């Protein structure tokens, strides 16, 4: 399932996430890019003078990333269990369009929290499954069926409320989840930032 990462991304959506990421990560920070895929966002961070480490479970996107960006520190990890990264070793963790694919959300969030330093920032994006989006899909049965096709690798679906509650439940504070992108009811993203508690 993970090897099927598309070659290209929606440029508007990618730009939205890039701007969000750069607004939260200062130059000189050490950032972990979780689910780095082909290294697009890791490369953006590196150009912004950020020390970045990218990890992914999929071999093929990482192979392409290493060809395009040989200067980046990109590593393949197992999908479950602890990552070979030191505790509290990153100022920020970025996980763009990843959380919806994770089977063990509790274990995954625990790993994100473990590698974040005290007070570090978690940044993530995921599709917005708010009420207007669901209504739009309900009015277009083919679109609804395609989105929730069991062969699609989205395992979880989030709204602003459910994502906020999830992050707060894992001890993150200053949680800010915003819906961004097209007009309400169109394809939108949740952009979330949260701080790791100091204890």
List each language-model region with its residue ranges.
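Conserved class I S-adenosyl-L-methionine
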Residues: 123-145
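A short glycine-rich, Lys/Arg-flanked "PGG" loop and its adjoining helix->strand segment in the class I
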Residues: 106-118
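Short glycine-centered segments of the SAM/dcSAM-binding site in methyltransferase folds
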Residues: 30, 119-121
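Short N-terminal helix/helix-N-cap motif within the alpha/beta-hydrolase-1
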Residues: 60, 103-107, 134
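Conserved N-terminal segment of class I S-adenosyl-L-methionine
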Residues: 1-86, 92-96, 109, 139, ...
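A short His-aromatic
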Residues: 97-101
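A generic structural signal for alpha->beta connector loops
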Residues: 49, 71, 119, 171-174
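A short hydrophobic/small-residue beta-strand
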Residues: 52, 122-123
